[in-house]
């Protein structure tokens, strides 16, 4: 393993085949030594820890996080105590309480956490999830009317509601009590109701802004137990052990792509440990439906196996399937729901492929992806609103800039869109501003993702508004769009032992990226194109030793073309992944970027 030298660009790569610079992830030398001494780490791992901003006094908690050390005081969240009091009041009074959840994994996980706590308290909590196509995102007056007609007295919204001031006002006007639990960006003035608990609420000093909604709900469960205990409700009985449900908190954190630091890292790390038992009937059934075997749970299970299938219900099927799956204790019901979600996921993939192909052709025909503008906005008639977010993410990866994809209903002229952003460009804030300026019918989100509703004849205005509003962030964001390398390795050193050494830094996500390794002047052997535009090959060093490698969705891009051409002389950056196919314990490199030394300036 080598250090890559002192060049301002790692291996001299000032422009890779994807247009990015390569840099060594910076780490302060004194901090590297401190981690080596305090934790007994080898230099490469200590350097990676320091490069992730982990202080000397944080190293032990980072590598072995615990809830005891990192759990925040629930009362540090604005309105948390009021929310706990209102919900426990309802449980004690036997009031009809319903949960209103968003239709993604975070919403489903949040709802399931509350359902399981209510069940442990001997109470029921019916779930309401709006239909993405007919109702759209978040609470509405019509939805609250429906809940009122069903006999609801208290409604708890999860993963939504913080920006639904008008809808919540309507709910209160018709006699409903409302508690909002959310994590999305919101206006200064919250909805007027019993409580608005939001880790990103202006004035909230919890310091937990990186939590998903499921993380906020998990803290709420602790507050509920505390309030119920204060009232003597656990005299002679055990309080619900909320640690059993950490797997649901981890699902929300991983699938909502939250920053895995501090308390949120502990939730996720310990949640994956709980998930590894596969005690939740819904998760176990969904894993089986996906054709995977139970075993130690990783972020990959949540983000790439379970999460897309749970989301499929909200994207192109029945929105409440995911929440019902995660809430049920009936193995047969779980199996039926899991099989339905797996089938919907297959259908979703085909719809996604069609929309992606159309969007790529439309944008690249006009050159909008390469005209220097900070944002790409692309629309199409009758593109399924359930897949526009996934497509936006694919195109963001392809063009390395924020992308908003809008599906327009050709009948009513209303577009529903979703956007994905780049680090350093706050798309949620820009969309919120567009809504407040009257450009949108609805809109909101967070830094890296946003959703919106817009009239078709306002899309051009939206494009101009976003480009103007985000232009100032573009230079800094482009500087951030670098491939940051943790270490230079030879193919012979890219082993299972190296993978397991750096796996101590898991779980990975925003604020704790997977280790990135660079291989210099490798020879590409056995290149082959795969279905889906993927490329597989072997990367060999001067001594002939090689490592398996795969590059996703790049066969038609310069990096993929260079790999398919084969031959020597390329530099490759990527992440090591476990390769346990057919019982072998190997590794393969998941390629992030490719550079040709003849083209790096």
Region roles according to the model:
Residues 145-214, 218-235:
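Active-site cavity-forming subdomains of large catalytic enzyme subunits
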Residues 2-28:
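N-terminal amphipathic/basic leader segments beginning at the initiator methionine
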Residues 131, 198-200, 407, 595:
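Residues at the C-termini of beta-strands that transition into short coil/loop
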Residues 168-169, 205-208, 293-295, 393-394, ...:
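A generic local secondary-structure boundary/capping motif
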């Amino acid at each position: 393993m080598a250090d890559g030298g002192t060049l301002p660009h790692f291996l001299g790569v000032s422009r890779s085949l994807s247009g990015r610079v390569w840099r060594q992830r910076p780490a302060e030398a004194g901090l590297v030594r401190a981690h080596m001494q305090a934790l007994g780490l080898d230099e490469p791992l200590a350097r990676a820890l320091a490069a992730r901003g982990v202080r000397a006094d944080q190293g032990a908690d980072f590598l072995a996080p615990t809830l005891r050390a990192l759990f925040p005081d629930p009362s540090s969240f604005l309105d948390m105590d009021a929310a706990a009091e209102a919900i426990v009041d309802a449980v004690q009074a036997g009031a009809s309480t319903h949960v209103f959840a968003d239709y993604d994994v975070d919403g489903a996980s949040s709802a399931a956490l509350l359902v399981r706590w209510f069940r442990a308290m001997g109470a029921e909590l019916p779930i309401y999830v709006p239909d993405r196509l007919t109702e759209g995102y978040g609470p509405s007056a019509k939805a609250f009317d429906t809940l009122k007609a069903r006999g609801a007295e208290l409604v708890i919204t999860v993963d939504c509601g913080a920006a639904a001031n008008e809808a919540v006002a309507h709910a209160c006007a018709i006699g409903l009590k409302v508690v909002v639990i959310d994590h999305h960006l919101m206006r200064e003035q919250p909805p007027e109701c019993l409580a608005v608990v939001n880790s990103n609420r202006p004035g909230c000093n919890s310091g937990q802004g990186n939590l998903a909604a499921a993380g906020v709900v998990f803290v709420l469960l602790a507050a509920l137990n505390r309030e119920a205990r204060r009232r003597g409700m656990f005299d002679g009985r055990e309080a619900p052990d909320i640690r059993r449900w950490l797997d649901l908190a981890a699902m929300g954190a991983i699938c909502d792509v939250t920053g895995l630091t501090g308390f949120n890292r502990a939730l996720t790390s310990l949640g994956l440990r709980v998930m590894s038992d596969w005690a939740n009937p819904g998760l176990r059934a969904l894993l089986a439906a996906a054709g995977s075997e139970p075993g130690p749970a990783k972020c990959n299970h949540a983000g790439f196996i379970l999460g897309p299938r749970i989301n499929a219900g909200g994207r192109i099927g029945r929105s409440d399937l995911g929440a019902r799956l995660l809430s049920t204790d009936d193995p047969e019901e779980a199996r039926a729901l899991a099989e339905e979600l797996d089938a919907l996921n297959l259908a979703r993939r085909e719809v996604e492929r069609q929309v992606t192909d159309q969007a790529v052709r439309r944008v690249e025909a006009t050159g909008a992806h390469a005209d220097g503008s900070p944002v790409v906005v692309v629309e199409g008639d009758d593109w399924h609103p359930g897949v526009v977010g996934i497509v936006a993410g694919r195109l963001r990866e392809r063009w390395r800039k924020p992308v908003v994809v809008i599906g327009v209903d050709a009948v009513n002229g209303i577009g529903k869109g979703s956007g994905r952003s780049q680090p350093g460009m706050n798309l949620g804030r820009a969309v919120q501003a567009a809504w407040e300026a009257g450009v949108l019918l609805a809109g909101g989100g967070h830094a890296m993702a946003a959703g919106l509703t817009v009239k078709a004849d306002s899309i051009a205005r939206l494009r101009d508004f976003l480009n103007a509003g985000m232009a100032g962030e573009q230079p800094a964001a482009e500087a951030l769009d670098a491939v940051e390398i943790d270490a230079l390795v030879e193919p012979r050193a890219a082993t299972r032992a190296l993978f397991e050494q750096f796996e101590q830094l898991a779980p990975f996500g925003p604020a704790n990226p997977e280790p990135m390794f660079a291989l210099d002047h490798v020879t590409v052997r056995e290149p082959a194109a795969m279905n889906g535009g993927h490329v597989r090959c072997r990367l060999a060093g001067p001594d002939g030793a090689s490592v398996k490698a795969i590059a996703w969705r790049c066969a038609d891009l310069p990096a993929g073309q260079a790999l398919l051409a084969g031959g020597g002389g390329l530099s490759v950056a990527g992440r090591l992944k476990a390769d346990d196919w057919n019982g072998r314990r190997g590794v393969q490199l998941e390629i992030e970027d490719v550079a040709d030394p003849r083209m790096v300036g």
